[in-house]
Amino acid sequence: MAPGANIHIPPAGPPEPGPLYSDFYQQQIERQRNNNYHSTSLRNMVATSVNRTALHPGGVQPGKGHTELEEELHEHAHIDYDRVAIIANPSVAALYEDALVYETGTAITSSGALTAYSGAKTGRSPSDKRIVKEESSEKEVWWGPVNKPMTPDVWRINRERAVDYLNTRNRIYVIDGFAGWDERYRISVRVVCARAYHALFMRNMLIRPSAEELKHFHPDYVIYNAGSFPANRFTEGMTSATSVAINFAEKEMVILGTEYAGEMKKGVFTILFYEMPVKHNVLTLHSSANEGQNGDVTVFFGLSGTGKTTLSADPKRALIGDDEHCWTDRGVFNIEGGCYAKCIGLSAEKEPDIFNAIRFGSVLENVVFDPISRVVDYDDSTLTENTRCAYPIEYIENAKVPCLSDSHPSNIILLTCDARGVLPPISKLTTEQTMFHFISGYTSKMAGTEDGVTEPQATFSSCFAQPFLALHPMRYARMLADKISQHKANAWLLNTGWVGAGATTGGKRCPLKYTRAILDAIHSGELAKAEYETYDVFNLHVPKSCPGVPDELLNPKNSWTATTSFSDEVNKLAKLFNENFQKYADQATKEVIAAGPVVQ
């Protein structure tokens, strides 16, 4: 080398792109953007390629390693991780960004919550629920209208259909979480979905693992949500383009033909209704639960729309959970990491805890908002009556976290929403009456909680959970009877429905302030000491007075204003109770049967 010659030292990083390379680079960036990929992934790819030439400016990309999660998805579901961007356990902010960019109907509301649209299905589709009929669970499952059987062959067809759909997406989301706050019984759940809205929903509803727990997370159950794509209608047993199917042997759930996020939540619930009693002798409950300052626990049974979420959000008591629980030999634990509250008619005055929980990180579902101010109109039911919000349970100021109690319930409240207006607002139940009304599960099907329901309809739902049950109702009922007997709990029938008359004959919904006053009297012990009278036909024990509640409201006969005969209406409902109970009478004791109404 000649003295004084300049020595060229190449840069440590990749060389500066020449014009041809630069054009290629920009073209690929644009192509990735059009295909909804993250352009940062391409920059990394181009920067790490080797053997770049003028003819082949992209060079050769070394084979990249895959994460443990990606390898599991590839092995079990054949997810093409080299083509599909697998976004695993993303942050709330990242899910907001993707939902806003890629999902129609998504916006940030004035409170900071994300609002999403679930499409044509704005409620659950119970008629499309299927359980795979296979050897390991066949003798346990309660087969019939609630749990329709699906053959393993049809399962495989629809499962592959869901996986094929997910493989056509440019990005899919994976959310890992736990169901059950008691570590002795919790199950690990993985959700694989195509919508950021669904991912954020389940991030809120499952119990969020720590960073350390996520490192080597292995799911017990996997949910494949391909809800944007229809089921194969021509396979055996399919009645529509919607399919919500669970396979207890494969430990998987597949959703097709519905984007309603509540299907995932209730699918996990059905899994727990199977796993807990069968494998652990633990009772699963469709209930909310809270705890007083003295450690006393109250459990609220009830169907959607009867007030479980609203009534358990009590500023004077710590919230254990609003919808799904298990009762063990040690106490009660919440299944979920979040709450899924109805929003229709919501206001800061009536339900401040829920109203204030709707903020950044929460997911509003099918609400209507002002396009300028982004303020949500909670009274607007244009899209559905079943407007909802999913938020982490920590958003409730007085939530008890971890969400479990070492105390056994001292008060068990069976919630009902009587559209006929003939059941008392509150009744004290004997053990036998508790069994009768638990097995009956009477309420009125509330507008919007299921697809196609717009007016209240009288219905019976065994264990207040019939759409979610996996086993025969009497199996849960016997377990509850044992718990009540063992722990000497007080039981109450609380009607949050109509008073004065029926829903169609001029009655009005029982004001929330009176329902809360009744609960306060239960928790203080005053109501248990009150003077009672017998309410005819149903033979219920009704208090003559309750602090904060008008006396005439406590006995429906005294507050009846409808032109129809009160006696006729009571007896009509009594007949419906007795007709429904015939389905379970062969497995019920004489004492429980006698605890039902006597038609006069």
Curated annotation (Swiss-Prot):
Task: Report whether Lyase shows up as a keyword of the record.
Answer: yes
**Cited InterPro entries:** PEP_carboxykinase_ATP, PEP_carboxykinase_C, PEP_carboxykinase_N, PEPCK_ATP_CS
- Sequence positions that bind ATP: 302-309
State whether keyword Coiled coil applies: no
Q: Which domain of life is it from?
A: Eukaryota
Transmembrane feature ranges: none
What EC number(s) would the UniProt record show? Answer: 4.1.1.49
Q: Name one GO biological process term.
A: gluconeogenesis
Q: In the record, what terms sit under GO molecular function?
A: ATP binding; phosphoenolpyruvate carboxykinase (ATP) activity
- Pathway note: Carbohydrate biosynthesis; gluconeogenesis
Which GO terms of the cellular component aspect does the record hold? cytosol
Q: Which SUPFAM superfamilies match?
A: PEP carboxykinase N-terminal domain, PEP carboxykinase-like
Instruction: Enumerate the UniProt keywords alphabetically.
Output: ATP-binding, Decarboxylase, Gluconeogenesis, Lyase, Nucleotide-binding
Tell me what reaction this enzyme catalyses.
oxaloacetate + ATP = phosphoenolpyruvate + ADP + CO2
Q: Name the NCBIfam families for this protein.
A: pckA (TIGR00224), PRK09344.1-2 (NF006820), PRK09344.1-3 (NF006821)
Q: Family, per the entry?
A: Belongs to the phosphoenolpyruvate carboxykinase (ATP) family.
Q: What is this protein called?
A: Phosphoenolpyruvate carboxykinase (ATP)
